Regions:
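A short glycine-rich, Lys/Arg-flanked "PGG" loop and its adjoining helix->strand segment in the class I
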Residues: 174-186
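Conserved SAM-binding loop of SAM-dependent methyltransferases across substrates and taxa
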Residues: 101-112
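Conserved beta-strand signature within the Rossmann-like core of class I S-adenosyl-L-methionine
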Residues: 187-195
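Substrate-binding/catalytic lobe of Class I Rossmann-like enzymes that use SAM or dcSAM, i.e.
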Residues: 196-301, 305-307
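Conserved SAM-binding loop
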Residues: 129-130
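Conserved class I S-adenosyl-L-methionine
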Residues: 90-98
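N-terminal auxiliary segments of SAM/dcSAM-dependent transferases
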Residues: 1-51
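A short acidic, Gly/Pro-enriched loop at the edge of an enzyme's catalytic core
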Residues: 150-159
Length: 307
């Protein structure tokens, strides 16, 4: 699997490499371009994502603690572990960078009693999450912002960010970690869930443009574990307290998404998506699933603390 994936990737990179790099450079995540990059993927419509995601609408890896868990149970196990790593209490004010559709913000407020401020660049997700908190009766405890993470203000007790760092871009990773430090009080904890590239592949990957960056997530970039650790050491006072790898869980999550997408295709097609879109998304699911199975990419939960 890994050898085949590598050949596919090398072939793709050689095809139009200079043009692809130029296009990727123009999509770098400035404040203005970041909003466009997010909209290109996440504003395809909330109804579209509801067809293949779990009941809570989480678009990130689940954590399966046994073979019998379904997708929704795995997603809730993921949220529980993140909140437990942060040791959330009712007195905490939690900052979430990357709202998604509001599942984690709702979960933390409901089950741990904390206040939550969460931010997104997607207008579709902002509208959905705001309405979600109102339906849940949590509008007084959860604030949903339409705001770039670099423009956040204030100080928080805990910080969480789930698979948002991949949308930051390599150039802006130092600013991302500095922002996380600036928004956390001294002694505060941060929990990140991040898709990572193998350390050994990081240098070559950072000089190329892959299928995901070109067609699925414009402006996207996967960090490596070593790169994140070095950036935190160089630019912040964060100390890593826990690192938990769950790569095989992402392969299983993607298999669920692929199956649900295929099963719901007739309904998805009615939303205005064509056969090319169907093939591209099935390739995207399969491409990523193969990467996680081959362990060329993985996903980790990283917990760090300001000292």
């Amino acid at each position: 699997n890994g050898e085949v994936l590598g050949r596919l990737e090398r072939g793709f990179r050689l095809l139009g490499k200079p043009v692809a790099r130029l296009r990727h450079w123009t999509r770098r995540n400035t404040r203005a371009q970041a909003r466009e990059n997010i909209a290109a993927h996440y504003d395809l419509g909330n109804e579209f994502y509801a067809y293949f995601l779990d009941d809570d609408l989480l678009y990130s890896s689940a954590l399966f603690t046994d073979d019998q868990q379904d997708l929704t149970q795995g997603q809730r196990a993921k949220m529980a572990r993140l909140c437990d790593q942060l040791a959330l209490t009712p007195g905490d004010h939690l900052l979430e960078i990357g709202t998604g559709w509001g599942a984690l913000a709702e979960y933390a407020a409901r089950h741990y009693g904390c206040r939550v401020t969460t931010t997104t660049l997607s207008r579709e997700q902002h509208r959905w999450a705001t309405e979600r908190m109102a339906r849940a009766g949590l509008q007084d405890r959860v604030e949903v912002l339409l705001c770039d993470y670099r423009d956040l203000r204030g100080e928080y007790d805990k910080l969480v960010s789930v698979e948002m760092i991949e949308a930051v871009g390599q150039r802006y990773l130092p600013a991302f970690f500095r922002t996380c430090q600036a928004r956390l009080r001294p002694g505060g904890k941060m929990a990140l869930q991040a898709i990572t590239i193998q350390d050994q592949r990081y240098r070559d990957y950072s000089k190329s443009v892959d299928f995901i960056q070109r067609y699925i997530f414009p402006g996207g970039f996967l960090p490596s574990i070593t790169a994140m650790s070095e950036l935190m050491t160089r630019h912040t006072d964060f100390v890593v307290r826990n690192l938990f790898d769950m790569g095989p869980d992402y392969a299983r999550t993607l298999a669920h998404w692929r199956q649900r997408f295929t099963h719901a295709w007739q309904d998805i097609e009615k939303l205005g998506f064509d056969e090319r879109f169907r093939r591209m998304w099935l390739y995207y699911f399969g491409y990523c699933e193969a990467g996680f199975n081959a362990r060329t990419i993985s996903v980790v939960q990283l917990t760090a603390e300001r000292v």
